[in-house]
Design a protein with these regions (language model features):
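Bacterial N-terminal signal peptides that target proteins for export
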Residues: 1-9
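C-terminal motif of bacterial Sec signal peptides marking the signal peptidase cleavage site
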Residues: 18-21
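Predominantly extracytoplasmic/ectodomain segments of secreted and cell-surface proteins
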Residues: 23-171
Length: 171
């Protein structure tokens, strides 16, 4: 009877040890963090122009015209990953208002978030395509990796003509 009890006890301990050894690994979920992140596409969704015109009576007037996709006046953007710059080679018209621009960004698969650096501070703002951005000066836009520990910073410039088309400028 004691041998049977000892045999049953040993069998129970070995079985329990075998079952418990499997529990540790399956309860842990492993995640792979990718450091590669990039902005892969940028386009302007909406931008305003301040159009100057002369009325029939000879007075000057200004009205605002909003350009949206798929306007032919909205340029494409070049993304230079080596120099970390984004810019338009075809300048926007002179009367374009760069202070409130809606843009759309596409990012690589493993990008965790996109943030825009403030104009007067190092504060970062989460990018959304529904918030306008002031591009009167070049802006830094950061694409972070999936766990937000590393980022790639791009210097984004929206170019516009410096003088009105068809005007003569003397220095």
């Amino acid at each position: 009877r004691d041998k049977r009890f000892l045999y049953t006890l040993c069998l129970t301990i070995v079985s329990s040890w075998g079952l418990l050894s499997c529990l540790g690994d399956s309860a842990t979920t492993e995640y792979t963090i990718y450091d590669e992140t990039a902005i892969t596409h940028m386009e302007i969704l909406s931008i305003n122009r301040k159009i100057h015109t002369t009325s029939k009576s000879g007075g000057d007037s200004v009205y605002t015209k909003t350009l949206t996709r798929p306007s032919k006046l909205l340029p494409g953007f070049t993304i230079d990953h080596e120099n970390k710059t984004i810019y338009n080679t075809d300048s926007l018209p002179y009367d374009t208002d760069l202070s409130r621009v809606l843009i759309s960004l596409s990012v690589s698969t493993y990008t965790g978030g996109v943030y825009v650096k403030g104009t007067s501070s190092d504060e970062l703002y989460y990018y959304t395509s529904t918030d306008s951005i002031d591009f009167t000066t070049p802006r830094e836009i950061r694409a972070y990796n999936s766990d937000l520990t590393k980022y790639r910073a791009y210097q984004v410039t929206i170019n516009k003509h410096q003088v009105e088309a068809g005007s003569i400028f003397w220095e």
